[in-house]
A protein has these predicted regions:
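Non-ligating segments of multi-cofactor redox enzymes
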Residues: 1-244, 249-250, 256-502
Length: 502
């Protein structure tokens, strides 16, 4: 029963989280966006103390339920492992924990996060890794299927579906997603939860807490006949059948061992110290030494202190920061500074909180957000206006961000946030290069920051050119996107390091 409940809940959570990345309309986020906000690392970076405490208490009570139910990457590995198990059953075996590797990776991860090297650290973040896979690899297939339905529906005079553009947002991010998928697939196919118990920093932290979980799978040595069936079905490879022991730091509470044991020797129940449960027949049971307990406590307290310090540092940073031309694709201009969405507050706040999960990229209806190719901000979204511009009536990216990189922003607030300003390039402007009237940028500026004036003040009939009022420009990119000049726009937006209210 427990295994069935766990499987059902995990499948529902996994399906809904995956759909959040596939849903290009953003409709599902109204009801299920909270599933992204209860992921451990995004909640920690967002200083969402309520969620972090909830996950810690959940782990302390029931073990690593988060890893087996809530984390989409963990459930994805379970699916791969389940398919693999159809061909070869009882293929797992116990293996000793590689503590040196687990804690080394965790230490490096925390150091990189504190040092601001998020673009490297987030390569290991489980939720973000799955988000990149879903956004870059699964979403194009989903969109292709949608376009196929739209094609046939249109011929039946139905407009229930509409076509969407399928495009590569970032080649480097897609390649990283492919490599991540291949590595995880191989590990899960061969060894189940190897990644979760050797590399994943979230799994290591929750593993330290789960050692002290109140409810755990317990082996009743009086019923166990040493058949080893539980160990051969343990995807975490954490059951030592010879010693009748379970490594609770690696156990993901999947309940598979309980369902496989034919003698009822494993039950999920309240843990008791061995000296309370030992019987005369159970001569093989070993009491936990004071030294082991002290070491475990030190590990737990050390990890807790490091993570608490990280949270405080992030909090302090947050306070301080406070058709006239040939039709061809536009090229990205060389911007002085990258552009970050309204609600990001500043470049510093955005880059230090963003986990590059690509959720905002997936829901952006105007195709403005795309992953960065810059090494220091690799995979973190930034704005570019070749395919669209940031419309004043859209705040979807701020609604879905789970990590606090983009703060929730109302429509009124967004219209007053200056994320950058427009820069005019005289050499590319159509009225001067082709001698034709234009004014596209001025007509579509939502704030009236662009005015058309005579290029020669002494001649009223001279071609009119745009003049940008930097104080009124909010950097939405309408001018850049709608400029007919090719391949580079005659006007482009450069970002501000610190966003301003105008």
């Amino acid at each position: 029963m427990l295994r069935t409940i766990r499987l059902t809940t995990a499948i529902v959570c996994f399906t809904l989280i995956t759909l959040l990345f596939l849903d290009f309309t953003g409709t599902l986020h109204t009801w299920f966006g909270w599933l992204a906000k209860i992921q451990f690392l995004p909640a920690l970076l967002a200083l969402n103390i309520g969620v972090v405490l909830f996950l810690i208490v959940l782990t302390f009570l029931f073990g690593r339920i988060y890893c087996s139910v809530i984390c989409p990457l963990g459930v994805f590995q379970d699916i791969v492992s389940w398919v693999s198990g159809k061909q070869k059953k009882n293929r797992f075996r116990y293996s000793p924990a590689m503590k040196w590797l687990r804690y080394s990776v965790l230490g490096v991860f925390i150091i990189m996060m504190v040092a601001g090297l998020n673009s490297l650290a987030i390569l290991l973040a489980p939720y973000s890794a799955y988000g990149r896979i879903a956004s870059n690899l699964f979403a194009p297939v989903w969109q292709w299927g949608n376009n196929l339905l739209a094609y046939f529906a249109e011929r039946m005079d139905s407009y229930a579906f509409y076509e969407v553009d399928i495009w590569i947002k970032s080649l480097s991010t897609m390649l990283i997603a492919i490599v991540t998928l291949v590595v995880l697939f191989i590990l899960a196919w061969r060894n189940g939860r190897t990644y979760c118990n050797t590399i994943c920093p979230v799994g290591t932290v929750l593993g330290i807490i789960s050692k002290y979980a109140i409810f755990k799978p317990i082996i009743d040595t009086s019923k166990c006949n040493n058949c080893g069936l539980c160990a051969r079905n343990c995807k975490a490879s954490c059951i030592n059948p010879k010693a009748h022991e379970i490594d609770y730091s690696r156990c993901v509470t999947c309940m598979d061992c309980i369902g496989k044991c034919k003698h009822g020797a494993i039950t999920y129940t309240r843990w008791k110290p061995k000296n309370e449960t030992a019987t005369n027949e159970d001569t093989k049971a070993k009491s936990v030494t004071t030294e082991q307990v002290d070491n475990a406590r030190r590990s737990f307290l050390s990890a807790s202190a490091i993570f608490a310090t990280t949270s405080v540092l992030k909090a302090q940073e947050k306070k301080v920061d406070g058709g006239l031309a040939t039709i061809e694709d536009k090229k990205i201009p060389q911007r002085e500074n990258p552009i970050y969405p309204p609600g990001a507050l500043s470049a510093r706040n955005f880059t230090q909180h963003c986990t590059a999960c690509q959720l905002c990229v997936s829901v952006c209806p105007n195709q403005v957000l795309r992953p960065s190719d810059n090494l220091l901000t690799l995979m973190q979204p930034e704005m570019s206006y070749e395919r669209g511009y940031c419309r004043p009536e859209c705040t979807k990216c701020s609604e879905v961000c789970p990590a606090g990189a983009i703060h929730l922003t109302s429509l009124a607030e967004k219209s007053a946030i200056q994320i950058g300003h427009a820069v005019w390039i005289k050499e590319n402007c159509v009225p001067l290069t082709d001698g034709m009237e234009c004014g596209n940028c001025a007509r579509h500026c939502p704030t009236g920051a662009i005015q058309m004036v005579a290029s020669n003040p002494e001649k009223t009939d001279s071609p009119k050119i745009p003049v940008v009022n930097v104080e009124k420009c909010i950097g939405c990119g309408a001018c850049e996107n709608l400029c007919p000049s090719r391949p580079f726009s005659a006007i482009y937006v450069t970002g501000h390091q610190m966003h301003r209210i105008i």
